From Swiss-Prot:
Function (record text): Negatively regulates transcription of bacterial ribonucleotide reductase nrd genes and operons by binding to NrdR-boxes.
Keyword DNA-binding: yes
Protein name: Transcriptional repressor NrdR
Cystine pairs: none
Any one GO molecular-function label of the UniProt entry: zinc ion binding
Domain ATP-cone residues, every copy: 49-139
Source taxonomy: Bacteria, Pseudomonadati, Pseudomonadota, Betaproteobacteria, Rhodocyclales
GO biological process, one term: negative regulation of DNA-templated transcription
UniProt keywords, alphabetically: ATP-binding, DNA-binding, Metal-binding, Nucleotide-binding, Repressor, Transcription, Transcription regulation, Zinc, Zinc-finger
Amino acid sequence: MKCPFCGAEDTAVADTRLNDEADVVRRRRKCNACDKRFTTYERAEIQLPQVVKKNGLRTEFSRAKLRASLELALRKRPVSIESVDAAVADIEERLLSAGEREVTTQQLGELVMRELKKLDKVAYIRFASVYRNFEDVDAFSRAIREVSPAAKKK
């Protein structure tokens, strides 16, 4: 590890600690050239799949885009930031556990809809109306029946 103060590559680890979640390692280091101390944080690099768009283009998975999609559907709805964070983490975990190198935007959309259905039915309908390209009232009615407990009992 290069010293950020003098640029020397001769450094030693003085202390190592795991954070509470055990996903980050904090290391206190000491430069053997200038005797200054500094802290580094280490995290395992997670490789999320490439996103294949409808037109065939491939892009990097974007946590920010995923979060923005959820937040847009949940705008002005009584859902906590923590719940949104958990939904994003759940979607990422599903993508990682699938072990695929690529995921289609359709697959991502279905994962988002699954999370929104659990979080807020109105947000689910909002997202579904755009994602599934609802063109008439019947499409909305079908989606509402899908999430309405009263409609399922009949």
